């Protein structure tokens, strides 16, 4: 009877230990997945480094600046790679960035552009719309980068 109690206690201890290990593994896996999906946190540094390597998306900035100089009343035609100055180079810079950093990179570039050009009101809304759709013009994922409302940039 004493042997049976010892065996039962040992099995119970193994069962509890096994459950604790499985729980810890699940929690660790969940945290790692959240970090991979979230471009903020430690991945934000990676995005900044990629922006540096891609010269702060300078060709995208030049492309958007050129777009702002055109009349907003012109009949817009679909833009494709190879048809617009700086668009090809912008697409190449975005292509060399990780997919999870592309939208954040465009937001960083747009903040800088806003400061340089002192954009506000309708101009800011216009450049935001163009930046939101830049990845689809480059045929890259994600196809669209929401930039938030105009008030988010004030």
Curated annotation (Swiss-Prot):
* Comp. bias intervals (Basic and acidic residues): 37-52
Alphabetic keyword roster: Disulfide bond, Seed storage protein, Signal, Storage protein
- Which region ranges are annotated with the description Disordered? 29-52
**InterPro entries for this protein:** Bifun_inhib/LTP/seed_sf (IPR036312), Bifunc_inhib/LTP/seed_store (IPR016140), Napin/2SS/CON (IPR000617)
What are the recorded GO MF terms, alphabetically?
Answer: nutrient reservoir activity
Q: What SMART domains does UniProt report for this protein, alphabetically?
A: AAI
Q: Which residues form the propeptide?
A: 72-76, 151-154
The set of disulfide-linked cysteines is: 47-101, 60-90, 91-138, 103-145
Q: Which superkingdom is the protein from?
A: Eukaryota
Q: Which family does it belong to?
A: Belongs to the 2S seed storage albumins family.
The job of this chain, per UniProt, is described as: This is a 2S seed storage protein.
* Matching PANTHER family: 2S SEED STORAGE PROTEIN 1-RELATED, 2S SULFUR-RICH SEED STORAGE PROTEIN 2-LIKE
- Subunit details: The mature protein consists of a small and a large chain linked by disulfide bonds.
Identification of the protein by name:
2S sulfur-rich seed storage protein 2
Q: Which source organism does the UniProt entry give?
A: Bertholletia excelsa
């Amino acid at each position: 009877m004493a042997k049976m109690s010892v065996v039962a206690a040992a099995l119970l201890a193994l069962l509890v230990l096994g459950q604790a290990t499985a729980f810890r593994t699940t929690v660790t896996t969940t945290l790692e997945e959240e970090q991979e999906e979230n471009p903020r946190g430690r991945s934000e540094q990676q995005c900044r480094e990629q922006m540096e390597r891609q010269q702060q998306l300078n060709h995208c900035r030049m492309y958007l600046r050129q777009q702002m100089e055109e009349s907003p009343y012109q009949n817009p035609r679909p833009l494709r790679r190879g048809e617009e100055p700086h668009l090809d180079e912008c697409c190449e810079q975005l292509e060399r960035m990780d997919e999870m950093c592309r939208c954040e990179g465009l937001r960083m570039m747009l903040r800088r552009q806003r400061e340089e050009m002192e954009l506000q009101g309708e101009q800011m809304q216009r450049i935001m719309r163009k930046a939101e759709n830049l990845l689809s013009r480059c045929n890259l994922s994600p196809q669209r980068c929401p930039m938030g409302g105009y008030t988010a940039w004030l």
